[in-house]
């Protein structure tokens, strides 16, 4: 398989069409989409050669667009920086304005998978901007802050928005972030699990500060999308829920 390469610098995405999960409703399997040639339609795969942040060149076999969504202040930018750079953004909180993105290439079972990860603004005034970016997303990580009950209560509103603007087969995962702040926790783990079960979503708790489950969340999504786009007929189906439960349990000893 010949690998594509892209120079790293900032870029933009192109919108497309939609639908999604309902409480206790079945969700169809997503056939993940790899990058294809420059003649692909605007609502189709990401394009090879699309610029990304940083210097140097990324070599990859397939690429997918992953969006982080949720209320302002839930830690989307910190989670992304932790995964991309292995660092924690401590200090003054600065809200994302509009939308931004970073790229990272993972080795998934011998396949170079490029994740183009979009960090969205959670404030209401930027919603019309972020709506357009839902449409060609292959996966969405929906975050709430375990120390902020309102951000958890708003998850259903986010799911309604996703249902309206995202593709019906988008890969979706629910993340309860900031579990390092145990003394400030107001949303129990069981509440997150219950909501995720109601909507049929994989779920885990994360910490951008300690790194708990951050790599796991993105790796699980990369595995799911890679298999959707490249699964051989004889290859067993990758089960995202089972993988998250199995691998997440190994990190339980580190939970605050």
UniProtKB/Swiss-Prot annotation:
Lipidation (S-geranylgeranyl cysteine): 253-254
PROSITE patterns per UniProt: RAB
Biased composition (Low complexity): 12-23
Motif Switch 2 per UniProt: ranges: 119-136
Keyword Membrane belongs to the record: yes
Annotated region (Disordered), positions in chain: 1-51
Subunit relationships: Interacts with RIMS1. Interacts with ADRA2B.
Function as written in the Swiss-Prot or TrEMBL entry: The small GTPases Rab are key regulators of intracellular membrane trafficking, from the formation of transport vesicles to their fusion with membranes. Rabs cycle between an inactive GDP-bound form and an active GTP-bound form that is able to recruit to membranes different set of downstream effectors directly responsible for vesicle formation, movement, tethering and fusion. RAB26 mediates transport of ADRA2A and ADRA2B from the Golgi to the cell membrane. Plays a role in the maturation of zymogenic granules and in pepsinogen secretion in the stomach.
Name of the protein in question: Ras-related protein Rab-26
Organism lineage: Eukaryota, Metazoa, Chordata, Craniata, Vertebrata
Gene: RAB26
């Amino acid at each position: 398989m010949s690998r594509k390469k892209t120079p790293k610098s900032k870029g933009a995405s192109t919108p497309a069409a939609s639908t999604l999960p309902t409480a206790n409703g079945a969700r169809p399997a997503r056939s993940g989409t790899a990058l294809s040639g420059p003649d692909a339609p605007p609502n189709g795969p990401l394009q090879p050669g699309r610029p990304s942040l940083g210097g140097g060149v990324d070599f990859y076999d397939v690429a997918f667009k992953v969006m982080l969504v949720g209320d302002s202040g839930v830690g989307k930018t910190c989670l992304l920086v932790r995964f991309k750079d292995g660092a924690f953004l401590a200090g003054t909180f600065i809200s994302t304005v509009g939308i931004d993105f970073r790229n990272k290439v993972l080795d998934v079972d011998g396949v170079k998978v490029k994740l183009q990860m979009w960090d969205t603004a959670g404030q209401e005034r930027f919603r019309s901007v972020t709506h357009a970016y839902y449409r060609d997303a292959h996966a969405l990580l929906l975050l709430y802050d375990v120390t902020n009950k309102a951000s958890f209560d708003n998850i259903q509103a986010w799911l309604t928005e996703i249902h309206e603007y995202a593709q019906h087969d988008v890969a979706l995962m629910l993340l309860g972030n900031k579990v390092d702040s145990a003394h400030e926790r107001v949303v129990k783990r069981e509440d997150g699990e219950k909501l995720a079960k109601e909507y049929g979503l994989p779920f885990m708790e994360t910490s951008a500060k300690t790194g708990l489950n951050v790599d796991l969340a993105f790796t699980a999504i990369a595995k799911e999308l890679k298999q959707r786009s490249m699964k051989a007929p004889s290859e067993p189906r990758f089960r995202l829920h089972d993988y998250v439960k199995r691998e997440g349990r190994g990190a339980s000893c580190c939970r605050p």
